[in-house]
Design a protein with these regions (language model features):
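Phosphate-coordination/substrate-recognition cap region in phosphate-metabolizing enzymes
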Residues: 39-106
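Glycine-rich phosphate-binding loop signature in dinucleotide/nucleotide-binding domains
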Residues: 44-46, 139-147
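Short, conserved phosphate/pyrophosphate- and ester-handling motifs at nucleotide-, phospho-/glycolipid
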Residues: 8, 155
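Short glycine/proline- and acidic residue-enriched helix-loop micro-motifs
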Residues: 105-127
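GST superfamily/GST-like fold recognition
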Residues: 156-160
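Extreme N-terminal starter segment of soluble prokaryotic enzymes
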Residues: 1-4
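Conserved small/polar residues in nucleotide/adenosyl-binding loops
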Residues: 183-189
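Loop-to-helix element that buttresses phosphate recognition and phosphoryl-transfer chemistry
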Residues: 10-61, 121-133
Length: 189
């Protein structure tokens, strides 16, 4: 099994410094351009299947990368972005900070992610890791996927959570990627 993970392209809320979470924000013009550049770099990869977050920014990115190829696309909510609850849509950068908690507490999202407490109705990093681990375990255990090349379109935090489940250094949650980056893994017993 060969897995290619991609993070969605840029959205208007990325540019504005707003927390997106599970709010369905589509790609902006630059996000579409970034996805097209990624598609160019991945055009020779013979994908058998695509699994995507149901959020439009991830699905749009996947569809652009696939470029009209006849590849089945499956949506899976377990690879949606972390839910920030009632903080979604709120500015979270120092210049537009509007989160109803002291900025020092919010910064734990970056400095101590496992101690981060989201807004009401949101989920913790541990909850995100749990649902993405269920996804990982199911996909990598399916015998019908054993010889497949699979594109997985997801989100920055969700992708980090998936990878967190397989990294040796469990304390290091944040590994850097940029919008529409891709991560290539081979999964085997």
């Amino acid at each position: 099994m060969v897995l290619y993970f991609i993070r969605h392209g840029e959205t208007s809320w990325n540019v504005e410094g707003k927390m997106q979470g599970q709010t369905d924000i589509p790609l902006n013009e630059n996000g579409i351009r970034l996805a097209q550049e990624t598609a160019e770099g991945m055009k020779e990869i013979p994908f058998d299947l695509c699994i995507t977050s149901p959020l439009s920014r991830a699905r749009q990115t996947a569809e652009i990368v696939l470029g009209g190829r006849k590849v089945p696309i499956i949506e899976d909510a377990r690879i949606e972005e972390l839910s920030f609850g009632n903080w979604e849509g709120i500015g979270c950068r120092p210049e537009n900070y509007a989160v109803p908690t002291p900025i020092e507490e919010f910064q734990k999202f970056y400095t101590e992610p496992f101690a981060f407490v989201p807004g009401e109705g949101g989920e913790t990093i541990l909850q995100l890791c749990k649902r993405t681990k269920e996804f990982w375990d199911e996909v990598t255990a399916k015998p019908e996927y054993e010889d497949k090349t699979i594109l997985i379109a997801t989100h920055g935090c969700a992708l980090r959570a998936i990878l967190h489940n397989i990294y040796e250094d469990k304390a290091d949650f944040w590994h850097g990627f940029v919008p529409v980056s891709y991560t290539h893994l081979r999964a085997h017993e």
